[in-house]
Design a protein with these regions (language model features):
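Class I SAM-dependent methyltransferase Rossmann-like catalytic core
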Residues: 1-30, 40-48, 60-71, 76
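Class I S-adenosyl-L-methionine-dependent methyltransferase module
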Residues: 47, 51-125
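A short acidic, Gly/Pro-enriched loop at the edge of an enzyme's catalytic core
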Residues: 129-146
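A conserved beta-strand element that flanks and buttresses the S-adenosyl-L-methionine
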Residues: 146-147, 178
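Residues lining the SAM
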Residues: 148-152
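A short, conserved alpha-helix within the catalytic core of class I
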Residues: 154-169
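Conserved beta-strand signature within the Rossmann-like core of class I S-adenosyl-L-methionine
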Residues: 166-183
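Class I S-adenosyl-L-methionine
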Residues: 185-229
Length: 229
């Protein structure tokens, strides 16, 4: 991964709770966050004494490098949002500027925690479908894996085979996998959702789409749950 190809954009614990329908009991579980990037989910959960391990290839870079990239990409991202306001639901955030300020605060919370968390093994520079599943922390099963803004969202860039292989790997290390959102970047439903659901249903797993209490990308208010017996 090259840092100049990354667009860091982090989300908060409150957003994770809404995106993934996370109950208080579920927040006490051992959780794997896949594709967390500069989200403050891990930092906020750690403050509460909870257990989260985040994996993302961006963690190969230092806090200063990530902060610099955030500064480089912030204005282009907000400009793009302002050019396409009809793609979004302006309820949680008043407008693009309010969105931007919330994102900056979230990413700064992540950055303040990052180096300490990385040293503690909470931030791992790994990527799907090549997790080091034979080694800690993956040698002990996670109760829940949440995958935010990666699978399905980038269906134009990531193949169906990639999705199947990646989800298979997540299910090797977690009892349950939740994926949000189910839309692509253009706000259309991913064409991979149906074959992915069919694949895991045929394998005897519990598979369902759930509506969640979060919608920013218009129509993006559903997650996929896959649960092992």
């Amino acid at each position: 991964m090259k840092l100049n190809e990354v667009v860091p954009w982090g989300r908060s614990l409150a957003e994770y709770r809404a995106m993934f329908n996370l109950s208080e009991a579920e927040l006490r579980q051992r959780i794997l966050g896949c594709g967390d990037g500069p989200a403050s989910f891990n930092a906020e959960m750690t403050e509460r004494g909870r257990s989260v391990v985040s994996v993302d290839p961006i963690y190969q870079f230092s806090a200063d490098q990530i902060r610099q990239r955030v500064q480089q990409t912030y204005e282009p991202i907000i400009s793009q949002v302002k050019q396409n306001p009809d793609r979004y639901v302006w309820q949680t955030f008043r407008d693009a500027d309010a969105l931007g300020q919330a994102r900056l605060a979230t990413m700064e919370k992540f950055l303040q925690d990052y180096e300490v968390g990385k040293a503690a093994g909470r931030y791992l520079a790994q990527s799907l479908p090549n997790l080091a599943i034979a080694h800690p922390p993956f040698d002990q099963p996670f109760e829940l894996c949440v995958c935010s803004h990666l699978l399905f969202l980038y269906s134009d860039q990531l193949s169906l085979e990639f999705h199947i292989t990646a989800i298979d790997q997540l299910l090797q290390v977690a009892q349950e996998v939740r994926i949000f959102p189910l839309l692509q970047l253009d706000c259309r439903l991913s064409p991979y959702l149906e074959p992915v659901m069919q694949d895991w249903s045929d394998k005897g797993l519990e598979v369902e789409v759930q509506t969640v209490a979060y919608e920013f990308q218009k129509g993006g208010n559903q997650m996929l749950r896959i649960v092992k017996d």
